[in-house]
Amino acid sequence: MANHMLGLGSQFPTFSKTAVVSLEQGKEFATITSEDHKKDGKWLVMFWWPKDFTFVCPTEIAEFNRRAGDFADRDASLIGASTDSEFVHAAWRRDHDDLRGLKFPMLADTSKSLAEELGILTEGEKVAYRVTYIADQDGVIRWVSA
C-alpha cells in the first residue's frame, strides 16, 4: 500500500474530473467535482478499482450498483473511480452486461492526480488499489477500506 494513504480525519482532496454518467449518445460525459456532494449536503462514497476490462472488478461494481438506492437513502453520493480514461470506462460499460445500467458515475482519473493525493497508486504500474472512502458533508474522511 502507498506510504501516505489518507486516513480517518483527513480532508478528502478537491477534484474536478470527467466521468461517464450515461451511455446515451452525446450525454455520456460530465464533470464531477468534490464540491458536488457538499453543496447537496451529502456524504461521499468513492470506491476505486485498478483497471477496466478485468474479471473481478465488474462483480464489485455491479454490487455497488445493486446497493445504489441504499446509498441514496442515506444521503450519500456514490462514485466509482479508476485511472482509466472516460473513453475506456464508456467502452467497458457498453461491453459488459452488468455495467450498462449503472446508477452512479465512473470517474476517470487519467492524470492519476486524485489517486496520488489519496496515496493509493501502486508503485509499479501506477494504477489505483481497491479502496473505498467515505467522506462527510464537509469532506472529512470518516471511513476507509483498503
Protein language model annotation of sequence segments:
Residues 1-146:
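Chalcogenol-based redox active-site neighborhoods
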